[in-house]
Amino acid sequence: MIQGFATPEGTASFASKAMAHKENFRKIQNLTLSNIGIGTYLGNPDLETDNQQKTAIKQSILEGVNVIDTAINYRAQKSERTIGKAVSELIEEGKINRDQIFVSTKNGYVTNDGDIPEDFMQYIMREFGKKGIVKEGDISSQYNCITLPFLEDQLARSQKNLGLDCIDLMYLHNAVEGQPQMSHDEFIHHLSDIFEFFEKQRKEQNIKFYGLATWECFRVSSDKPNYLSLSEIIELAKKIGGDNHGFRFVQLPYNLSFDQAFMQKNQLADSNNQITFLEAAIHHNIGVFTSVPLMQGKLLEWIKNNEKFTNQSPSVDALQFIRSTPGVLAPLIGHKLESHVSENLQVLKIPPYTEQEFYDLFKKLTG
């Protein structure tokens, strides 16, 4: 197990030595984090993908990315293991220190193990059912489970997979979307217990921060049953953990097609005024990481044929727009092929848009 966690001193040192443009780092919770992160969602659970992903992670870190995101169910635990190998190799090679990089993962979805050739349900019964970790009714129709025994088991597995004794950020993974049968009040009751669990894990230095990784709940209108209020969640965190609570980050989809976080006024600023999710995140100092920046490649052709963008590559244009959006900490880009990694990381060589440049482009796109 690699000891330690991301620190203000370590992340600042990483930024000062990075090949990336100096404006491509942002301060949050006293940490200096790159405004591009590595995502590890896509890919088969096989050795070829392991090797591609490991090489991509190492190349990304060496070129100035110190945010790495995964989830225990990504590639059936193999993405976590690949990150662990990449990080440990870079540390052994003397190229980074543990305190320079920020690693996030997610727990909540039930997954098998890509390294064990066993039927999915047989694995679940053997690993969780027979051991009493999950019981009948715990797992939703979406294969999501948010009971404390399950989350405790998953945290320990994530630590082992990553080879890290402390995970910088642990997300509860798509809990609203993964528990469609649960009422709002019932969900908040469960979330209260989970936040207590996370605060305990912080005290034991198993995690530094916690957050919610989401798909729809922060992007839908407030009249929808799966809507969540950010201020309500923050108040819950304060009630459980006090002013120094660990709920400091959210992940949600945001790109040139999924623009709700920036456009839709669905959060309350006060009793009279509604603001967007990203405005609410700025107000509460919540770090927002964004997923699906390229819509798994579907946006690239549209960008390529849109003369309103610069002459950068389509992926750089997409990443530049997202990371320059006020309130966004960093988009998480999943890449494995060396050519894609090199192309995407060109964005690190240029500064993000100024706020004026961003709004000028936004007006062109929406005009």
Where do the model's predicted regions map?
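Catalytic cores of glycan-processing enzymes that make or break glycosidic bonds
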Residues: 134-138, 145, 159, 171, ...
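Structural signal for hydrophobic
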Residues: 38, 101-103, 158, 167, ...
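Fungal eukaryote-biased detector of long internal structured cores
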Residues: 144, 150, 157-160, 164-165, ...
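Beta/alpha (TIM)-barrel catalytic core signal, keyed to glycine-rich beta->alpha loops juxtaposed to Asp/Glu
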Residues: 2-24, 149, 156, 173-367
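Active-site mouth loops of central-metabolism enzymes
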Residues: 39-52, 136-152, 180-185, 304-312
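N-terminal binding-site loop/beta-alpha segment at the start of enzyme catalytic domains
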Residues: 1-126, 165, 182-185, 189, ...
